[in-house]
């Protein structure tokens, strides 16, 4: 079941929380709505579910306008972060609940409900816990029950609001893998909200990065990671070093140090330079490629590389992060002095990416 979102806006009072959102979600895809608090991702999810109404725009499922359709008639399953299980019901009864309250003409008989719930219990690997109550379950088990309950009514679309946010790190990883395997098996259309970048990258077919009620970028996990469309996406996803510089002619100056550029750009003046820690080059000697002196503050061995925190010497106030591959130089120790640089820097003037600009291989 595909989802088509066309120019949807939402206000809470006078505050606009969604700004003309347009997004197409193909049938069978798992899509992550990723962004910081206040980005509008949960509001958009609730509009898809029918738990909120948009002020403008159109929402369609497989070409049919459902904008004014009640939530109960949308055939959407919803999984909440804090499970929302009925404490007085057993696991079996929690999963069966949605089936038992269907209109009489659609409601399965008792035998069919028992069979359906039994299948779901096996699917979520909780068949041995059918008679337990929520208070007797772990967080991960509760979330599996919540997911089975959502799937019981065979929804066209499954929506999940930070489904693993209340769980510890190891359980989150296990459930992420399990959910992805379940999606591959059942091929349902799914949209989930998260602020966990690792979760979005691991589970989703496509990632929708949101900020302040706007969509910043839509793409595969690899696309949004390697080719961020905006400065916000670049700074939001993963760790990145931001340095202040100035372009003068065909030179990029950072403090008293400079890099040659491939050509003199149209833009002259102040810029921000962004480099991922693993994009930094490290040398024991100053060069055109590595002109910036640093001193090592912290060394964290990571097997085939070292994670370094280094203090710029005279050209930047705050420490920066550097990933040093094993074998490039002798094992680093705290207090060592090196020179850093990087050819894959992205240069911004405000929110404008400066293209085409590249750091020259040599002067």
Curated annotation (Swiss-Prot):
The lineage of its organism: Bacteria, Pseudomonadati, Pseudomonadota, Gammaproteobacteria, Enterobacterales. It is a peripheral membrane protein. PROSITE patterns: ABC_TRANSPORTER_1, ABC_TRANSPORTER_2, CYSA. The keyword Cell cycle does not apply. Its EC number is 7.3.2.3. This is Sulfate/thiosulfate import ATP-binding protein CysA. It is found in: Cell inner membrane. Transmembrane segments: none annotated. Belongs to the ABC transporter superfamily. Sulfate/tungstate importer (TC 3.A.1.6) family. It is an enzyme of class 7 (translocase). Pfam families: ABC_tran. Part of the ABC transporter complex CysAWTP involved in sulfate/thiosulfate import. Responsible for energy coupling to the transport system. The keyword Cell membrane applies. Residues 3-237 form the ABC transporter domain.
């Amino acid at each position: 079941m595909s989802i088509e979102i066309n120019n949807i806006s939402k206000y809470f009072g006078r505050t606009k929380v969604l700004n003309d959102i347009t997004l197409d979600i193909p049938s069978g895809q798992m899509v992550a709505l990723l962004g910081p608090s206040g980005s509008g991702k949960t509001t958009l999810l609730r509009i898809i579910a029918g738990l909120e109404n948009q002020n403008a725009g159109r929402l369609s499922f497989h070409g049919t306008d459902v904008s004014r359709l009640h939530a109960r008639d949308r055939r959407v399953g919803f999984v909440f972060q804090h499970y929302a299980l009925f404490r007085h019901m057993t696991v079996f009864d929690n999963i069966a609940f949605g089936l038992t309250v269907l209109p009489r003409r659609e409601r399965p008989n008792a035998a069919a409900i028992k069979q359906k719930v039994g299948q779901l219990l096996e699917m979520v690997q909780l068949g041995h816990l059918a008679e337990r109550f929520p208070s007797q379950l772990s967080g991960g088990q509760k979330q599996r029950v919540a997911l089975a309950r959502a799937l019981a009514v065979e929804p066209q679309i499954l929506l999940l609001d930070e489904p693993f946010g209340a769980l510890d790190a190891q359980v989150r990883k296990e459930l992420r893998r399990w959910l992805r395997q379940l999606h591959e098996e059942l091929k349902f259309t799914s949209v989930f909200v998260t602020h966990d970048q690792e979760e979005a990258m691991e589970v989703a077919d496509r990632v929708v990065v949101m900020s302040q009620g706007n969509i910043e970028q839509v793409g595969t996990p690899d696309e949004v990671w390697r080719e961020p469309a905006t400065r916000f996406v670049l700074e939001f996803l993963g760790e990145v070093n931001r340095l202040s510089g100035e372009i003068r002619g065909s030179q990029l100056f950072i403090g008293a140090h400079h890099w040659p550029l491939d050509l003199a750009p149209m833009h002259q003046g102040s810029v921000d330079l962004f480099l991922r820690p693993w994009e930094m080059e490290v040398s024991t000697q100053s060069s055109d490629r590595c002109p910036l002196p640093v001193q090592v503050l912290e060394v964290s061995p990571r097997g085939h590389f070292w994670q370094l925190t280094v203090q710029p010497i005279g050209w930047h106030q705050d420490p920066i992060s550097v990933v040093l591959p094993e074998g490039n130089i002798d094992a680093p120790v705290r207090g060592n002095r090196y020179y850093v640089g990087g050819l894959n820097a992205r240069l911004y003037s405000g929110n404008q990416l400066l293209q085409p600009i590249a750091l020259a291989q040599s002067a």
